[in-house]
């Protein structure tokens, strides 16, 4: 009798563990015996016990990556620090799961190198005044580069441009003189 109860409980547990409900704005990447099988979208799904495995739960909402200030050098050899924010969305859960080892680190490194390339073509004055142009160029470059990873870059913002202290002091003195 005890063995029958254990078997019934075990069978019920296996049946319940086969039912997976994927919540809104998420997708599950499924592997069968270690190989990619499919991507489950929102709703009710059944998995084969002991054979299918949820490899990754992927958030499909727009996400924000806030990176620490990056040192960059302008065309006129001024070193400044720029703080960036990247708004992105995962468009292909399979590519996101298998496309790159650590997507967040890859986006951070890609953002830093792209920022250095763009700022390296601009002088200090241009960098301080053409924030929108820099944002647009960065978004376009990052979106193309992250496409093979299943990521769409929606927006890039330069949160803060921090010039060197001596240049910042000179700018403050000039603004003070203009006000007087």
Where does each model-flagged region fall?
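Amphipathic, interface-forming alpha-helical segments with heptad-repeat character
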Residues: 22, 30-35, 45, 51-166
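Long, charge-rich amphipathic alpha-helical coiled-coil "stalk/tentacle" segments
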Residues: 9, 165-180
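Single-pass alpha-helical transmembrane signal-anchor segments
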Residues: 1-19
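Aromatic-capped interface at the extracytoplasmic side
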Residues: 14-30
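Terminal hydrophobic membrane-targeting helix
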Residues: 40-44
């Amino acid at each position: 009798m005890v063995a029958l109860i254990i078997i019934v409980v075990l069978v019920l547990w296996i049946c319940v563990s086969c039912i997976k409900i994927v919540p809104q704005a998420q997708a599950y990447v499924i592997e069968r015996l270690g190989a990619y099988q499919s991507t489950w979208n929102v709703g009710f799904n059944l998995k084969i016990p002991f054979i299918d495995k949820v490899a990754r739960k992927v958030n499909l909402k727009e996400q924000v990556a806030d990176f620490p200030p990056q040192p960059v050098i302008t065309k006129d050899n001024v070193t400044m620090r720029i703080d960036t924010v990247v708004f992105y969305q995962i468009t292909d859960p399979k590519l996101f799961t298998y496309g790159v080892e650590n997507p967040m680190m890859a986006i951070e490194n890609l953002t830093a190198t792209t920022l250095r390339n763009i700022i390296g073509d601009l002088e200090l004055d241009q960098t301080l005044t053409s924030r929108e142009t820099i944002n647009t160029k960065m978004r376009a470059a990052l979106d193309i580069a992250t496409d093979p990873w299943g990521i769409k870059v929606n927006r890039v913002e330069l949160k803060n441009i921090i010039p060197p202290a001596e240049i910042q002091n000179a700018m403050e003195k000039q603004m003070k003189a203009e006000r007087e």
